């Protein structure tokens, strides 16, 4: 007889199973997949630790949370700093001062504000009818054409002019030269992958 039957061996299920077991409860975890870890499952591909279901970067500003996950695995100091390649030109993401300098040669936050105001002036009184118009109203045509249009159309599989404007409510603009994607104090990826965390959480649990 079990106290808890947990459906899903992902992070949430594994944490609950670990905490319940620690408190003396008898737990069983089941999952329809043939592996534990859920969407943070990692696999070794020719010596490379691959996040099978897409990249997951752990980040938090809560020290209690950070200390908790670090008891199950050692984390590296990976900082996510995405770069977009548009026809051979490189741009930092999210949009920040480095992005704007590469795009326009602007060097100060005020220059960026002035440039964006100039780029979006013609859309001031326009009610966007589609995603393209919404993006241009928010950030202007230069950024839209180079860093939003292609990615968005590939993601949705249709023209940006056929997508509703509400998909983009706002676009993050950072007026600093910090390329860190996240603002959290703690971040990284567990050395050896997330499997290490899940395996350590479930080592005393029936799966």
For every predicted segment, state its role.
Residues 26, 49, 74, 206-207:
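Conserved beta-strand segments of alpha/beta enzyme cores
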Residues 21-46:
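Glycine-rich FAD pyrophosphate-binding loop
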Residues 2-29:
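N-terminal Rossmann-like FAD-binding beta1-loop-alpha1 element of flavoenzymes
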């Amino acid at each position: 007889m079990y106290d808890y039957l947990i459906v899903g061996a992902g992070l949430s299920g594994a944490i609950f199973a670990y905490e319940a077991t620690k408190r003396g409860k008898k737990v069983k975890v089941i999952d329809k997949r043939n592996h534990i870890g859920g969407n943070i499952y990692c696999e070794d591909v020719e010596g490379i630790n691959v996040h099978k279901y897409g990249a997951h970067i752990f980040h938090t500003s809560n020290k209690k949370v950070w200390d908790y996950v670090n008891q199950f695995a050692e984390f590296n100091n990976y900082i996510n700093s995405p770069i977009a390649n548009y026809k051979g030109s490189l741009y930092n993401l999210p949009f920040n001062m480095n992005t704007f300098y590469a795009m326009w040669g602007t060097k100060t936050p005020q220059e960026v504000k002035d440039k964006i105001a100039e780029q979006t002036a013609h859309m001031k009184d326009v009610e966007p009818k589609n995603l393209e118009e919404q993006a241009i109203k928010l950030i202007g045509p230069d950024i839209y054409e180079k860093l939003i249009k292609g990615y968005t159309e590939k993601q949705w599989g249709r023209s940006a002019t056929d997508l509703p404007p509400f998909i983009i409510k706002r676009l993050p603009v950072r007026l600093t030269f910090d390329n860190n994607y996240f603002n959290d104090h703690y971040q990284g990826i567990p050395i050896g992958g997330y499997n290490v965390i899940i395996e350590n959480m479930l080592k005393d649990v029936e799966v």
